[in-house]
Amino acid sequence: MLGEIYSGGLGVPENQETAAKWYRKAAMQGNDGAQYYLGECYYLGKGVAENDAKAVKWFQKSADQGNADAQYYLGECYYLGRGIAENDAEAVKWLQKAAEQGNADAQTLLATCYFRGNGVLEDERKAASLYQKAANQGHAEAQYWLGNCYRFGWGIKKDPRKAIEWYKKSMDNGYYEFNIYDSISFVLYDIIFEMEKIGTSFQKIARSKELAEGIQYAEYAINHFDCENAEDGDIYITLAELYRYKNLDRALDYAEHAVALGVEDANETLKSLRLANGTFGNIGRFLSGIFD
């Protein structure tokens, strides 16, 4: 297709306007691929002025011919209300068609619809199943959400180690948002907490790879993302709890920072650490803060 050649610069200088022109010619002749690509041009403003209504028009024509990519985008338009009135039921209808053809984007968004009950009855098991299908295709966002399913037991048996496995796969595929570092460090802390409950020694935990990894991911997050707010600042509590096994002074510093940010439950963590510090050393710092 000439449009693809100009769009990708395949043997010719890249030219999105020329690509859109050739897509239009083929689309007018009923080519479903060209109709999809022309819709995408309008959706993203590639080679033409962005126009959601025209995007929907061409996505619809292509989707009616069974094009899975167009079906996904048409479903997304209904889901977001872009170029057409928001309609969750219609969104699900088109996402389902695309998902059945193996479109990973559609499987992921359809899973979210089932998870939230948008256009369908809420069904966490079906959501987890769809996230799994997309995740198996390497879809980074689906892998992140599948990690969440394993972390919280949403529609699937809770398994913190599988959660971490899928979080890491998501990162391998380019998902580098703050919440994935936050999630990994918190799940590792949960694993450490379970280790302590079954009698693992303090010294063994302090030397564990789980502790080292938890600190590594959490410290990366605070150094590379804006966590200086009450919502995301809970990662400082995670760091404080992790450092409880390694360095009480640093644990106290992180807990105090969480308190300063107004993080929920930070005061409880700080008091617990001050009690521990009063038991194991630095009694002056313990006494100065325990009655705050």
Task: Mark where each language-model region is.
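Short helix-capping/linker turns of helical repeat alpha-solenoids
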Residues: 8-10, 28-31, 44-46, 51, ...
